Amino acid sequence: MADKRFFGTKTFPNQEKALKAKIMNNDAFISWIEKNLGHRPKDPALFLRAMTHPSHGNSDYQRLEFLGDRVLGLVIANWLYDLFPREPEGKLSRRLNSLVSGASCASIARIVGLPQWLRLGKQARDDGAAASDNVLGDVMEAMIGAIFLESGIEAAGKLIHKYWAPLVTGQESAPKHPKSALQEWAAAHNRRPPVYEIVSRTGPQHNPCFTIQVSIAGVGEASAEGSSKQEAQTAAAQALLDILAQ
């Protein structure tokens, strides 16, 4: 179990009391955690907090997400280190970055049925936060953080190994980042480096949508959307690579 001298969360009595009152009688929520995440909550309010978006109130998932992100990274990094003993650091890093990405975490969140339990403010719900990869990825990491706090790295690792296994074993080779691949294509064909431009930014602050265009002079261009500039750039680079491969 995690040592709470180091990992304990700061709580506020009135908020904690309200959270516990709201969840203690919700057997369906507790049963869902036990069935899908393999963990019986000792403190249901901790897991309710992991499901609470900042738009809903003060006691939200952000601190738990911060912790869960590090736990996920450590477990995956150790897994890859053991699984691919001959791979250099660069290839391991590319595998890791793909496996802990927001899109990967969001895909797991959907598999376990997490969206139905999200606690969102009205505006966030109306804006589609329940379908946002950013939000779902963060909440999945927050749940990992909550399990770590209650039962330690072994319990969190068991969950991660169960749901990330298809992603880990599905990587036949270390994935090359689309932006790097496009850069290499341009260099190999004596072209100028790709240029990325922001076409637009729409949506609310908690669920933005960026449209990015990438172009290689004299070759072509492609556009794509993403919930962050980096995500949109990656998608645009992949779109242009797909065009070049035709």
Curated annotation (Swiss-Prot):
Q: List ligand-binding residues for Mg(2+).
A: E65, D138, E141
Where is this protein primarily located?
cytoplasm
* Pfam families the UniProt entry points to: dsrm, Ribonucleas_3_3
Write out the catalytic residues in the record: D69, E141
CDD domains the record matches: DSRM_RNAse_III_family, RIBOc
PANTHER family according to UniProt? RIBONUCLEASE 3 (PTHR11207:SF0), RIBONUCLEASE III (PTHR11207)
Annotated protein name in UniProt? Ribonuclease 3
Q: Which organism is it from?
A: Zymomonas mobilis subsp. mobilis (strain ATCC 31821 / ZM4 / CP4)
Q: Corresponding gene? A: rnc
